[in-house]
Amino acid sequence: MEIRSDDGARVRIRPVGYQPGIDPPDDPERAAPGWQDWLLIEVDARTADGQTWSHHYPSLLVEEARALSSWLHGQAIAAAGPTPPPAMVRFTEPNLALRTRAIRRRRLELTVEFSAESLPPWMRRPATAVYPLLLTVSADALTVAADQWAGHCEAYPPRTRSRFPVDGPLPHRRRAG
């Protein structure tokens, strides 16, 4: 998916495969949830002032990746309401987190937080370092990104049973707009 901000900043995030070196379980029904389901995530980011970086890292479990689409859809829908509360989603690996804050009706500030192996190369890397990439986006653009992300995730079905229902921990919602 690609999300572009009004100020020229952008982020592209997509799954590019299962974590290398981890074979699928012989019996998916008996395997512990998650271990074989790490996805290699490719990130390409650009700040508003033109600094760029990219990386590949096994950052999300399949179920987390699928749940992200529902979360993004939910944020787009909430932005249509009068005063949606700020929201955040974190994952098992601390490389990525996302926050939203309503700016005005149907406009959001989406903060993509990078940490650990996902930090930009120009940052020092103490264990607690976080780099926030702020993106100002419309609810419609966030819906498009959620649909793109869901499409990317279809190529990577779970290889073990999930802790969540098929559509993830959040109910699938209709498109905003």
In which residue ranges do the predicted regions lie?
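Residues that cap or initiate secondary-structure elements
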Residues: 19, 49-51, 104, 118-120, ...
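N-terminal domain-start interaction segment
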Residues: 1-54, 173-177
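A structural detector for beta-sheet-dominated domains
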Residues: 4-6, 14-16, 44-48, 63, ...
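Mixed-charge, glycine-accented linear interaction segment located at domain edges/termini
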Residues: 113-177
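Intrinsic, low-complexity N-terminal interaction/targeting segments
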Residues: 24-25, 33-39, 88-124
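Short, well-structured hydrophobic secondary-structure segments
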Residues: 37-80
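Short glycine-rich, low-complexity/disordered patches
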Residues: 74-98, 155-177
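Alpha-helical rod/repeat scaffolding segments in eukaryotic adaptors/tethers
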Residues: 54-58, 82-85, 128-131, 135
